[in-house]
Regions:
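Active-site-adjacent loop/helix surface patches within enzyme catalytic domains
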Residues: 1-103
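Basic/polar, cationic surfaces and motifs that engage anionic cell-wall
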Residues: 76-170, 181, 185-188
């Protein structure tokens, strides 16, 4: 997650306010400091209404990490090098401890694409995948760009949605608005340079 608030102080205050009904297990400050907010054995309220594969409401079986970032509403910024170094260290520890599969390293927008954009298109998913955290494709960007403007058939478009479902995205009862948000969620993770919600050959 990113915090999506104007300041780090406000984010910490909200995450420790019982009335807000939102929390996380770990908080990573802009300077890279890691704060344990909720012990791992306890459920934190970070995922909210969420779905991935066959799981619904992922609070009960996930570990939530919040990273300081103003987000799309208040001036979305690149994550600091110190934040990413701390995130890599923390995530590697959690992967080893709980034997977490790479395909289950997720962003908030993966599990709640209808209402969330975080961690967003500036989150370094490719860099993390190189460090064996999460997944990334192996197709050269140059080759992908060449086919971006080619016409795509309805059959191919429908197959793309089916493949998203196979990965883990929840694709039932999609209307035009939900479909747009779903595709944008995928693009924010795997094609960060162009997030337009359009299904194309790339």
């Amino acid at each position: 997650h990113y915090t999506g608030m104007r300041s780090e102080t406000k984010a910490l205050k909200r995450l420790t306010d019982d009335k807000a009904k939102v929390s996380c297990h770990y908080f990573i400050k802009r300077n890279g400091q890691i704060i344990l907010m909720v012990p791992e054995l306890y459920e934190a309220w970070h995922a909210g209404k969420s779905k991935w594969k066959k799981d619904i409401s992922l609070n009960k079986n996930s570990i939530g990490v919040e990273i300081t970032n103003k987000g799309h509403d208040f001036g979305y910024q690149s994550y600091s090098k110190k934040q990413i170094l701390s995130l890599i260290k923390l995530t590697k520890y959690l992967i080893k401890k709980y034997k977490i599969k790479s395909s289950n390293i997720l962003g908030h927008s993966d599990i709640a694409f209808e209402r969330k954009k975080d961690p967003g298109e500036k989150f370094p998913w490719k860099h993390l995948a190189i460090k064996n955290i999460g997944i990334w494709h192996k197709i050269e960007k140059r080759k992908l760009k060449k086919i971006r403007k080619l016409t795509i058939s309805d059959f191919e478009s429908n197959m793309f949605i089916k493949y998203l479902n196979k990965i883990g995205y929840f694709v039932k009862n999609l209307n035009i608005k939900k479909k747009l948000k779903l595709v944008k969620s995928f693009q924010r993770r795997f094609r960060q340079e162009l997030v337009n919600g359009k299904i194309d050959k790339e």
